[in-house]
Amino acid sequence: DLAALDAKTSVLPEVQTNYKPGVKNGALTYLDGQAALDSILVPEGYKIEQWATEKEFPFLANPVQMSFDNKGRLWVATMPIYPNYRPGDARPDDKLLILEDTNNDGKADKQTVFADKLHLPMGFELAPEGVYVSQGTNLVLLKDLDGDDRADEQEIIFSGFDDHDTHH
């Protein structure tokens, strides 16, 4: 008898959520860069410094993966409205960014959008032939054909992955 068995299970605790009903796709709230730094306990003899923030680079919102290339530039996959995308919603405009410090002052001062109109770019890998991006239902290869640090071509390498629940 399932009802008798269920009666023996304990009540699960309520899960706290950041979901705000009535707000389309939730709200993006971040600590200011300095406030975030101030909240981190740093061991004596060490320091942390801000290199790039959403204030200088608004497209940097909700970074998911970062990787340095052999030129010392930081590549960042971003999903600004994740995890609030639902199948049937308008596709998000997720991006793959390149941030760099062109004047060697220890802070990012240049942003290039390598690719936009991505859909849930959960990870990427830099390769000689381009950038492999796992996004949504596909693994794609993005290629920069003219050397301007912007993807010119997208090739689907694998497809058919299920993304009905975007929380992997």
Functional labels for PLM-detected ranges:
Residues 1-168:
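Beta-propeller domains with acidic blade repeats across secreted/periplasmic ectodomains
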